Regions:
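Conserved donor NDP-sugar-binding/catalytic core segment of glycosyltransferases
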Residues: 64-96, 171
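Glycine-rich, basic loop-to-helix element that forms the pyrophosphate-binding segment
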Residues: 31-47, 68, 118
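Short aromatic/hydrophobic "clamp" motif used to bind/position activated sugar donors
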Residues: 52
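Membrane-embedded multi-pass helical conduit in multi-pass membrane proteins
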Residues: 215-294
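Catalytic donor/gating beta->alpha subdomain of glycosyltransferases that bind UDP-sugars
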Residues: 73, 140-141, 147-202
Length: 294
């Protein structure tokens, strides 16, 4: 069965959804614009199958995406597989934002283990009865509903497995303003997740933590360099000894964390050369802090 849910669209999509509903295998649901989590819950309550697969309007699944997830569904020893998640490939357009986003998401999937803590919204399927028994998707989670429901399943003893063979293709994510708004929203959702699900290790954060700490640690490193220069200026003669003595324990302690951050940044896939890329990282870091603090 195919279930289409229209979340109060105003671009003519409702007519198209109702047109498709004439097919015997298609169920169409229209509702007011109350959010993606409520959409998924409406579909879940209408579904009849053993497995409940979800995707989004801004992706195009490969024809075999559900077959590939079903292949990965059998539980191994000690597992109770309740969800399977696949891989989302972000397209690239002729702008820096889409390239950064595409490369970042690709790097996350490259290091993703088979057993994971997140069934991503664009490409996942769930044991329908298990998900319903835990309350399904919470409509109050307007965003990050996939994170919330995944952790609910894991805390109940379930296993989520990842298969790279199930693929959906995401449209390019373009535009700096929209990108920053989404990252701010992501940060706010992570705060909410950590408050509700304490002690749960998340394995799909990727390079966001590097970007998050960019502003404070670069500022801390700059202060350490300024302190070192200040110490140097107190010497009458600049030689090897003065350069060594100016490197006080305070300077070392202040600079050690920024050096660890710099090492992680240089090993990441984040942009490092072009000024525009650096500017995007700075504004991205600010957006994350806004989402956390505001």
């Amino acid at each position: 069965e195919i279930i289409l849910v229209d979340d109060g669209s105003t671009d003519g999509s409702t007519d198209k959804v109702n047109e498709w509903a004439s097919h015997e295998l298609v169920t169409a649901i229209t509702q007011d614009p109350i959010g993606l989590s409520a959409v998924r819950m409406a579909a879940l309550e209408s579904a009849k199958g053993e497995w409940f697969a979800i995707t989004d309007i801004d992706v195009r699944p490969e024809k075999d995406w559900i077959e590939r997830m079903l292949e990965a569904a059998p539980s191994q020893s000690g597992e109770q597989v309740v969800a399977v998640t696949g891989r989302t490939i972000f397209g690239q357009a002729d702008d820096v934002i889409s390239r950064i986003r595409s490369i970042e998401i690709e790097s996350k999937y490259r290091s993703r283990p088979r057993r994971t803590k997140l069934a991503n919204g664009p490409c996942s399927m769930f044991k329908r009865e298990v998900l319903l028994s835990l309350g399904g998707f919470d409509p109050s989670w307007y965003h990050a509903e996939d994170m919330e429901v995944s952790l609910k399943l894991v805390q109940d003893g379930g296993t989520i497995v990842y298969t790279p063979n199930a693929v959906v293709n995401h449209i390019p994510e373009t535009g700096l303003r929209r990108f920053l708004q989404k990252r701010k929203r992501d940060a706010r959702a992570h705060v909410r997740i950590h408050r509700r699900y304490k002690g749960v290790k998340h394995d799909f954060i990727g390079s966001s933590w590097i970007v998050l700490w960019m502003i404070p640690l670069v500022a801390l490193g700059s202060f350490g360099i300024a302190l070192y220069v200040h110490n140097l200026l107190n010497f009458e003669k600049l030689d090897l000894e003065s350069f060594y003595l100016a490197l006080t324990k305070e300077v070392i302690l202040i600079c050690i964390l920024p050096l660890f951050w710099l090492s992680a940044y240089l090993r990441s896939n984040l942009p490092k050369r072009r000024l525009k890329g650096i500017f995007i990282l700075i504004t991205w870091s600010i957006a994350l802090w806004q989402g956390i603090l505001l």
